[in-house]
UniProtKB/Swiss-Prot annotation:
Cell surface proteoglycan which regulates dendritic arbor morphogenesis. Residues 104-124 have a biased composition (Basic and acidic residues). This is Syndecan-2. Interacts (via cytoplasmic domain) with SARM1. Forms a complex with SDCBP and PDCD6IP. Residues 170-202 are cytoplasmic. The lineage of its organism: Eukaryota, Metazoa, Chordata, Craniata, Vertebrata. Residues 1-22 form the signal peptide.
């Protein structure tokens, strides 16, 4: 039993360390992108013209445009609904959010030239179709998949606890019966001989 707990502890430590190692390696901020050195931190184009034309007094022209801020009135009654909202969007709106491709325009044109006319006309990306997206509530336990995972984890934990209790009771009973090997040697039958029960009086 002691070995099982030690083994379980080692497995748990290995899982936690693997999880933290995966988080560290997946972090995009650790490595610089070699393709975009100009966008990297601390690398700026050299422009000496701005330094020579400034007076240093701070009274120069203000080349910045004023920032515009917009505000919306906040509704007085907060919206509280437990039902998720359904928002309709079209594929063209979703495709506007897709990041730009890394192919050059010449490669894209070459691919379009090689496509037959029947495939070009029936491109599903160009058609507007309705897509329903469900907005999830802010509360974590109101989401069905999280609630199902918590319930399943609770049931498995409860069954595991019952299993451990039953195993403990079984071992205690077996130990009380005497058939449980405790590592002690039983004395041989020749070691203890029964004394004669007859008494002789002189």
């Amino acid at each position: 039993m002691r070995r099982a707990w030690i083994l379980l502890t080692w497995v748990l430590v290995a899982c936690v360390s693997a999880e933290s190692r995966a988080e560290l390696t997946s972090d995009k901020d650790m490595y610089l992108d070699n393709n975009s050195i100009e966008e990297a931190s601390g690398v700026y184009p050299i422009d000496d013209d701005d330094y020579a034309s400034a007076s240093g007094s701070g009274a120069g022209e203000d080349g910045e445009s004023p920032e515009l801020t917009t505000s919306r009135p906040i509704p007085k009654i907060p919206f509280t609904s437990t039902a998720p909202r359904v928002e309709t969007t079209t594929l063209s709106k979703i495709q506007d959010k897709i990041p730009a491709q890394t192919k050059s325009p010449e490669e894209i044109d070459k691919e379009k030239v090689h496509l037959p006319d029947s495939e070009r006309k029936t491109d599903p990306a160009e058609e507007d179709t309705n897509v329903y997206t469900e907005k999830h509530s802010d509360n974590l336990f109101k989401r069905t998949e999280v609630l199902a995972a918590v319930i399943a984890g609770g049931v498995i934990g409860f069954l595991f606890a019952i299993f451990l209790i039953l195993l403990l009771v079984y071992r205690m009973r077996k130990k009380d019966e005497g058939s449980y090997d405790l590592g002690e040697r039983k004395p041989s039958s020749a070691a203890y001989q029964k004394a004669p029960t007859k008494e002789f009086y002189a």
